[in-house]
């Protein structure tokens, strides 16, 4: 299919996903280059005309977070100066989403700052997947299309027979109950909740306090929006195994997997971790316990629907 007035550009963070999205749409990626000067300054060059086009930029603000964010801002500036008709940013993983409120005195709300920066740069629309906090949509005065990874994850477990009353979907904390309930609805399973307390002094650490729900003799599926150092999800998995779960699977949309994450996962009770490709994982980080499924078709369909001014609501259903 040809979209003569649409362009899709990839920046540095997830070119592999961008290529899959372009292939699903039947188009070629736009031609551009990104380079850094010796002092770290970023320069972007657009190597084809985009005058009058609706331009989509695909870039996750994963590690290195600040470089990837600056690439977007610089690219948007270049596109505006080159007379793009409309600029939409496809940010599968929205970095700084964990800083969505003041948890303590004198803290910034960096998620809002990032929203301000994108708008001031000239972004007309944002397409993202599973924000850490859904209220971040309200930080923007431009349209925000918030896709969900749960239908894709549900499709995977459905294909592997992990459905029904013998399976329990588990939220690793109270904040993820809505996400767990959605997956449980797709799979027609009960849910359970891990009651945990996060350390106020140490980042990325938490202690399992209690399991709310029956997991004994059940296959458990943990679901979270992101896994960073994997401490929380692995502690939860081990607690479920100790409580009598016959098997523990885990899933997340965003595989940040920083620091000791891979070692933690390897040593944990998790049998298989299912992740999406919102963040690029090189082959050496795809250990045997990790299986990655692609959001390319979902993102491609969303881009097409946005461009053609059609609703995105059908994309929130299992099997689409």
UniProtKB/Swiss-Prot annotation:
Gene that encodes the chain: prs1
Keyword NADP: no
Annotated source species: Streptococcus pyogenes serotype M1
Family according to the record: Belongs to the ribose-phosphate pyrophosphokinase family. Class I subfamily.
Cofactor, how bound (note): Binds 2 Mg(2+) ions per subunit.
GO BP terms in the entry: 5-phosphoribose 1-diphosphate biosynthetic process; purine nucleotide biosynthetic process; ribonucleoside monophosphate biosynthetic process
Upper taxonomic lineage: Bacteria, Bacillati, Bacillota, Bacilli, Lactobacillales
Binding site for Mg(2+) 2: 173
Cofactor(s) essential for the protein: Mg(2+)
Main location: cytoplasm
Chain residues that bind D-ribose 5-phosphate: 198, 224, 228-232
Localization annotation: Cytoplasm
Quaternary assembly: Homohexamer.
Active site: 196
Pathway(s): Metabolic intermediate biosynthesis; 5-phospho-alpha-D-ribose 1-diphosphate biosynthesis; 5-phospho-alpha-D-ribose 1-diphosphate from D-ribose 5-phosphate (route I): step 1/1
Binding site for Mg(2+) 1: 132
Alphabetized UniProt keyword annotations: ATP-binding, Cytoplasm, Kinase, Magnesium, Metal-binding, Nucleotide biosynthesis, Nucleotide-binding, Transferase
Chain residues that bind ATP: 39-41, 98-99
GO molecular function: ATP binding; kinase activity; magnesium ion binding; ribose phosphate diphosphokinase activity
CDD domains named among the record's database cross-references: PRTases_typeI
The enzyme's E.C. designation: 2.7.6.1
Listed name of the protein: Ribose-phosphate pyrophosphokinase 1
NCBIfam families assigned to the protein according to its UniProt record, in alphabetical order: PRK01259.1, PRK02269.1, ribP_PPkin
């Amino acid at each position: 299919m040809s979209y003569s007035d649409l362009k899709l550009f990839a920046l540095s963070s997830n070119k592999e996903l961008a290529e899959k999205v372009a292939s699903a749409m039947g188009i070629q990626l736009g031609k551009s280059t990104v380079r850094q000067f010796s002092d770290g300054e970023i320069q972007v060059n657009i190597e084809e005309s985009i005058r009058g086009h609706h331009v989509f930029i695909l870039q996750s603000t994963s590690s290195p977070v600040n470089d990837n964010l600056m690439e977007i801002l610089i690219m948007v500036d270049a596109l505006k100066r080159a007379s793009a008709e409309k600029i939409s940013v496809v940010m599968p993983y929205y970095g700084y989403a964990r800083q969505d409120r003041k948890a303590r005195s004198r803290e910034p709300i960096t998620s809002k700052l990032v929203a301000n920066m994108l708008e001031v740069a000239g972004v007309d629309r944002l397409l993202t997947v599973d924000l850490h906090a859904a209220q971040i949509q309200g930080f923007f005065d431009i349209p925000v299309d918030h896709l969900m990874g749960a239908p894709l994850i549900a499709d995977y477990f459905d294909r592997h027979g992990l459905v029904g009353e013998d399976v329990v979907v588990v939220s690793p904390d109270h904040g993820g109950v809505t996400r767990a309930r959605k997956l449980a609805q797709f799979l027609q399973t009960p849910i359970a909740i891990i009651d945990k307390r996060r350390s106020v002094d140490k980042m990325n650490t938490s202690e399992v306090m209690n399991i709310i729900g029956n997991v004994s003799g059940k296959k458990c599926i943990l679901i979270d929006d992101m896994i960073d150092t994997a401490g929380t999800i692995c502690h939860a998995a081990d607690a479920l195994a100790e409580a009598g779960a016959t098997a523990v699977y885990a899933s997340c949309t965003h595989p940040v997997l920083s620091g000791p994450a891979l070692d933690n996962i390897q040593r944990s009770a998790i049998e298989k971790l299912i992740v999406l490709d919102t963040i690029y994982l090189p082959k050496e980080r795809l250990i045997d316990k990790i299986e990655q499924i692609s959001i390319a078709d979902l993102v491609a369909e969303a881009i097409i629907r946005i461009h053609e001014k059609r609703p995105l609501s059908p994309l929130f259903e299992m099997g689409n």
